[in-house]
Amino acid sequence: MKVSDLFSAEMEPDLNDWLRKFASVGDLFSAMPQLYANLRAQNIQGIVEDGAVIVGAVHIGMGSVVHGRAIIRGPAIVGNNTFIGSHAEIRAGSFIGSKCVIGHSCSIVESMLMSSVNVCSGAFIRNSVLGFGSVVGPGAALGAEEVERSLGLVSETSSKIGVVLGDYAVVGANSSVKPGTIVGSCTILGEGVLAGGTYEPNQTVTLRQALETKPRSSGS
């Protein structure tokens, strides 16, 4: 699936231009360090509450709020008007777009979240790219190799390509999405699903269907 097929919604012009350079998801992952190439020091334009831990080169945009018990480790970028909740941890190599909500006790590791992404409490995201308006439910795990290794599904030498969610994709509560998974725009992975592979746009995947998919109209 092409990058242009996954991400087409409104986003910051500079980010839109940057994304259009890449034909494949693999190329996008390889180039992600370019986002932080010019980030050398802390640039705090938003509100960082007392008690928050900000380490290294971190940019926090205007109108953003970082809860007093959150942790952000640079290099990392947080866009404008974004909220980082209590006990959330943003680890080095992460890009959080504007108007995002990162809930209580979430972990974001070396991932790129575009604008208006909602990550609910307790979710874990590693080496992943989340499109505009996507939603990750409470307790969901994206690209968590530790879980997959415990099930014997990946090796220690697996690549650092995690999960890609297209614009407006949804991952339900307590679902686990395996590394290398691509979820098309407007596709829904229901609660408690163990998902892997490539899912075309406008699909619905539920636990009851045992990972079978069915077409879903764009208006439903």
Please identify what each model-predicted range represents.
Residues 85-86, 91-92, 97-99, 103-105, ...:
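Conserved mixed alpha/beta catalytic, RNA-binding, or beta-rich assembly cores of soluble enzyme
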Residues 56, 60-93, 99:
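Glycine-rich active-site/cofactor-binding loop and its immediate structural neighborhood
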